[in-house]
Amino acid sequence: MIDREGYRPNVGIILCNARNQVFWGKRVNQHAWQFPQGGINAGETPEQAMFRELEEEVGLLPGHVRILGRTREWLRYDVPPHWTRRDNRGLYRGQKQIWFLLRLTGRDCDVSLRASAHPEFDAWRWNEYWVPMEAVVDFKREVYRLALEELERYLHRDLRYLRQHTRRPGERREVPFDLQLKP
């Protein structure tokens, strides 16, 4: 399903843990790290596609996560011609993505890279939110930066929510959080 401009609709997923570290998956048999992502099927909403991709690539179900936010607009990247199949050249330019920021409410052991018959990742790790992007394929870096910048504000909102809801009634002291968010 490619639009008139040559972009395939897609979702990207930034999954973070309670320490605001983000999930990075290592592509099978490659040295490239990336966030989970995948195409939107005909008749699917971006949210439905996100939950399907999350289960296929990371093994997480809707009950394992909470949606913190999503990008307002499509973010696009062009795929270099040598990365596309010959039969798609001329029709396919790249991907347009809606990005979701999710909070893992489950546990690390809920992550399963073998949830589908064709795994995308063979390793995963948690990294700081603003990790350098050298390990990301170069043509995706700008979209990653834009998605991280737009969605970062939801982390601060979520931290305020967590702080407000972890105090006991009548307690006046701040809950100690030693999270360091980079600007």
UniProtKB/Swiss-Prot annotation:
Top-level taxon in the UniProt lineage: Bacteria
Keywords for the protein's UniProt record, in alphabetical order: Hydrolase
Family matches, as Pfam families: NUDIX
EC number: 3.6.1.-
Sequence motif: Nudix box, positions: 38-59
InterPro entries: Nudix_hydrolase (IPR020476), NUDIX_hydrolase-like_dom_sf (IPR015797), NUDIX_hydrolase_CS (IPR020084), NUDIX_hydrolase_dom (IPR000086), RppH (IPR022927)
Domain Nudix hydrolase: 6-149
Cofactor requirement: a divalent metal cation
Annotated GO MF terms: pyrophosphatase activity
Entry function: Accelerates the degradation of transcripts by removing pyrophosphate from the 5'-end of triphosphorylated RNA, leading to a more labile monophosphorylated state that can stimulate subsequent ribonuclease cleavage.
Entry similarity comment: Belongs to the Nudix hydrolase family. RppH subfamily.
The protein's name in its UniProt record: RNA pyrophosphohydrolase
